[in-house]
Amino acid sequence: MRMKLGGLFIAVFVFGAAVSTFAHHGYSTEFDGSKCLDLRGTLTGLIWENPHGYFDLDVKDASGKTKSWHIELLTPNAMRRNGTTRQDFEAHMGKVMDARVCPAKLGFGENRASAEYIKMADGIIRIVGQLPEKITPEQLSFWNK
C-alpha cells in the first residue's frame, strides 16, 4: 500500500510540474517568433500583473477598420529591471505608440501577440518581451521615426 501511495504521489507531482511549466513557459507553443510584425496604434489598456503584463493597442487595418490587439509583456519585475514601469504606460494612455510583436498562433486568439519592443510617444524604445528574432533596436522599422 505504501509503495502504491508513493508511486501515486510521484506521478501527481511530475504531472503537476509539467502542467505548470507548460502554462508559464510555453512561448513558442503560443506565439510565432518567425512572423513578427510592427504595429502602430493607440494605447487603450494595461494589465500590470504576474506572471505577465498586457497592454491593448487599437490599430487601424488597411481598410481603416480599428482592431484591438491584446499584447503580452514580460513580468512586471523584469520590466522594471529593463527601465519600464507601470507609470510609463499610464502616462501614454490614449497616445499613439509603435510595437514590434510576434502574433499568437492559430487557436490562441485573434489579434493577440507578445511584444518584443515598444516605442511610446516619448520616443524611447523599450525592451518589453522575449526577443525571438534576435534583432537590435536599430533594426526596427520605427527606430528613426
Task: Give each language-model segment a name.
Residues 41-43:
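Conserved hydrophobic positions within beta-strands
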Residues 23-37:
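Short boundary/loop segments of OB/S1/cold-shock single-stranded nucleic-acid-binding domains
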Residues 7-20:
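Bacterial N-terminal signal peptides
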Residues 81-99:
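Short nucleic-acid-contacting surface segments enriched for D/E, G, S/T with interspersed K/R
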Residues 49-60:
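Short aromatic-glycine-enriched beta-strand elements
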Residues 104-132:
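OB-fold/S1-family single-stranded nucleic acid-binding modules
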Residues 68-86:
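Beta-strand/loop nucleic-acid-binding surfaces
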Residues 133-145:
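Glycine- and charge-enriched low-complexity intrinsically disordered segments
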